[in-house]
């Protein structure tokens, strides 16, 4: 794919993400796998319970839209087995639509499947699922996907899970990085810390959570006087390459307009077609503000291309609203 063509595709994906963001439901699958010991079990339990509380109590995820799996079965928590994971995604395939959003969050241990470093497993209770198998499970799920693998063996998941319009995060940028990670704690914390809301919009986007957690990981290693053994990556172009939070790159445009919490409520007209146009205009206006916020990180040509695309579509939608009003 040419460098010239890539920005145009990114613009299209951002517009699509922005346009559908307010329309659908939100689902989440939060999994902490086999712990391998009491210390790890305590850590993973804390991450899981904190994150599910945020999704449920702060963001308002419905009980039947939030699937939680862990090493030990308990109330509203299934055992994290291969069979239960597969069953969850069979259910989601039936229930979700193209306008819905799904978050998949993995915390625990990850291991490489062989010496090539091309594939890895997320450790479950009993038989595991490899990155390739996760990709097969999720490719039939409709809607938008945010996939976050916070394990030490997460890097191979980046290129296995990457696809057009998806947002994929991993805790590591190399198959050689297989140590226990601190990324999950900081990623979860981002959604409860006003400091993560760098654009002061009142909400934390996936990109802002990624930036927040990446900076916290770096600071954690600096304070310990150690070289980092994890460097988080984010991919949302589908290229499967990704970028670090402070590195240049095209990735991040969709993540900047992707949120876990529902979109703010709009006062919508009773006419369904007109209501859809009002939603799209609001989403485009949000995308425009996001683009302005990252102007300094873009080349003049790329900024102009994205700005023209958004303004052109915004003008078209505004004319349609005027004609129907």
Residue map of PLM features:
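Active-site-proximal C-terminal subdomain of hydrolase catalytic domains
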Residues: 49, 145-236
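Caspase-like cysteine protease fold
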Residues: 197-281
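Boundary/activation segment at the start of structured domains
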Residues: 19-106, 110-121, 135, 253-264, ...
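Solvent-exposed loop/turn segments at secondary-structure junctions
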Residues: 34-38, 72-76, 108-114, 127-130, ...
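Alpha-helical, heptad-rich or low-complexity scaffold/stalk segments
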Residues: 150, 270-323
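Extracytoplasmic/secreted proteins, especially bacterial periplasmic and envelope-associated proteins
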Residues: 39-50, 54, 80, 84-91, ...
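Bacterial N-terminal signal peptides
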Residues: 7-18
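Second-shell loop/turn segments in exported
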Residues: 34-42, 71-79, 119-125, 171-177, ...
């Amino acid at each position: 794919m040419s460098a010239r063509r890539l920005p145009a595709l990114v613009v299209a994906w951002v517009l699509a993400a922005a346009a559908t963001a307010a329309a659908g439901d939100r689902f989440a699958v939060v999994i902490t796998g086999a712990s391998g010991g009491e210390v790890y079990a305590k850590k993973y339990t804390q991450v899981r319970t904190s994150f599910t509380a945020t999704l449920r109590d702060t963001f308002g995820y419905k009980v039947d839209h939030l699937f939680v799996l862990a090493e030990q079965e308990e109330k509203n928590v299934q055992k994290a087995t291969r069979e239960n994971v597969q069953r969850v995604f069979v259910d989601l395939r039936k229930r979700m639509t193209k306008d819905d959003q799904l978050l998949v969050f993995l915390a625990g241990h990850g291991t490489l499947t062989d010496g090539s470093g091309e594939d890895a497993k997320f450790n479950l209770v009993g038989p595991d699922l490899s990155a390739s198998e996760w990709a097969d499970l999720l490719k039939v799920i409709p809607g938008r996907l945010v996939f976050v693998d916070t394990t030490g063996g997460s890097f191979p998941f980046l290129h296995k899970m990457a696809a057009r319009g998806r947002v994929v995060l991993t805790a590591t940028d190399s198959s050689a990085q297989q140590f226990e990670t601190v990324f999950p704690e900081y990623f979860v914390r981002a959604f409860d810390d006003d400091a993560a809301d760098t654009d002061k919009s009142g909400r934390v986007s996936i990109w802002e959570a990624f930036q927040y957690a990446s900076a916290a990981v770096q600071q954690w290693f600096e304070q310990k006087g150690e070289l980092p053994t994890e460097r988080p990556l984010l991919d949302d172009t589908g290229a499967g390459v990704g970028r670090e939070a402070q590195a240049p790159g095209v990735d991040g445009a969709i993540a900047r307009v992707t949120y876990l919490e529902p979109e703010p409520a709009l006062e919508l007209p009773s006419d369904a077609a007109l209501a859809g146009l009002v939603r799209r205009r609001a989403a485009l206006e949000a995308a425009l503000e996001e683009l302005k916020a990252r102007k300094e990180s873009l080349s003049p040509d790329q900024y102009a291309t994205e700005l023209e695309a958004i303004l052109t579509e915004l003008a078209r939608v505004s004319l349609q609203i005027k004609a129907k009003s």
